[in-house]
Each structure stands twice: as structure tokens, then as C-alpha cells.
């Protein structure tokens, strides 16, 4: 159970935090520093290097959901939904041109997600509405803001 005052957060925001944590956590059920960065970015937030250093100084190599929740919850009410989606898009692609198979595979490997190449291609095909083999920013935003089911 989360120990913080969640009055400022909606149920959807709390669910988002949990989903982000679950997406990036290791087999031990915790996030290491790299996974913390990815989970923050997926939520449209940036964690400072100072905060990561504080975690290290406390001797923590990884953090639990409750610790992650405590870290990220102050950032959530301040987010702009469009900038959140843009941050999430940037998780996948550095140059802004679009998410390719290679980008998607790299993120899957970085977060420890085992996906077959076929599954990754299916994901791209599902979101790629213009058929160019790349998920551009508008396709990504459309995917993330509509309730489609694979």
C-alpha cells in the first residue's frame, strides 16, 4: 500500500504510476537507476541527477514501488498531457523522426521485455497508420490517446 497522501492525485494518475513502475521493474520487483529514469520519462517527468545520487548515497541500488511513488508523485500534478506524450515518444527515438523497429527493439531490450521480432513488427504495423513502417509523433499520440485494443 502506498504510504503517501494521494489526495492530490486522481485514481488514473495513481494507476499510471503503477503501470510505469510495473513496465520497467526488474525481476526482483524493483527499479534500478536506469529503470527509474525510463519510468519517469514514460510518465512525462524528468528525474534529476541529484535525486539519483541521493538514492545511491542511501546505499540503494534499486527502489520499491512505494519509494518510486514517493519520488514521482510530486511531479504528476504539474505535467501537461501533451508534453507527457512527447516525453514518452522521446523514450523511443532520439532524433524525433519516428519509432522504427530498431528503436522499439532497443527499448524492449533496455527494459528487459522479451518480445519476438514478429510481435514488435505487429506493434509498429498496428500504430503506423500511414504505412511507412515508422511510428511518427502524431501516430504515437493518436495511439496513446485512443482506446484501441490489440
From Swiss-Prot:
One of its GO terms (cellular component) is centriole. GO terms for molecular function: calcium ion binding. Ca(2+) binds at residues 128, 130, 132, 139. Residues 12-46, 80-114, 115-150 form the EF-hand domain. It is found in: Cytoplasm, Cytoskeleton, Microtubule organizing center, Centrosome. InterPro entries: Centrin_CML-like, EF-hand-dom_pair, EF_Hand_1_Ca_BS, EF_hand_dom. GO terms for biological process: centrosome cycle; microtubule cytoskeleton organization; microtubule nucleation; mitotic cytokinesis; nuclear envelope organization; nucleus organization; regulation of centrosome duplication. Keywords: Calcium, Cell cycle, Cell division, Cytoplasm, Cytoskeleton, Metal-binding, Mitosis, Repeat. It holds the Pfam family EF-hand_8. The keyword Repeat applies. Belongs to the centrin family. Plays a fundamental role in microtubule-organizing center structure and function. Binds one mole of calcium per mole of protein. This is Centrin-B.
Amino acid at each position: 500500500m502506498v504510504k503517501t497522501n494521494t489526495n492530490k492525485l486522481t485514481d488514473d494518475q495513481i494507476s499510471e504510476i503503477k503501470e510505469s513502475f510495473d513496465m520497467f521493474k526488474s525481476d526482483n520487483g524493483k527499479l534500478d537507476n536506469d529503470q527509474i529514469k525510463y519510468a519517469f520519462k514514460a510518465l512525462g517527468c524528468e528525474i534529476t541527477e541529484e535525486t539519483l545520487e541521493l538514492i545511491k548515497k542511501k546505499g540503494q541500488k534499486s527502489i520499491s514501488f512505494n519509494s518510486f511513488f514517493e519520488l514521482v508523485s510530486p511531479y504528476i500534478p504539474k505535467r501537461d498531457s501533451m508534453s507527457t506524450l512527447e516525453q514518452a515518444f522521446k523514450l523511443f527515438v532520439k532524433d524525433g523522426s519516428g519509432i522504427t523497429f530498431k528503436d522499439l527493439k532497443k527499448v524492449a531490450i533496455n527494459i528487459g521485455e522479451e518480445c519476438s521480432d514478429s510481435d514488435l513488427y505487429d506493434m509498429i504495423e498496428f500504430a503506423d497508420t500511414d504505412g511507412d513502417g515508422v511510428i511518427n509523433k502524431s501516430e504515437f499520440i493518436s495511439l496513446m490517446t485512443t482506446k484501441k485494443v490489440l
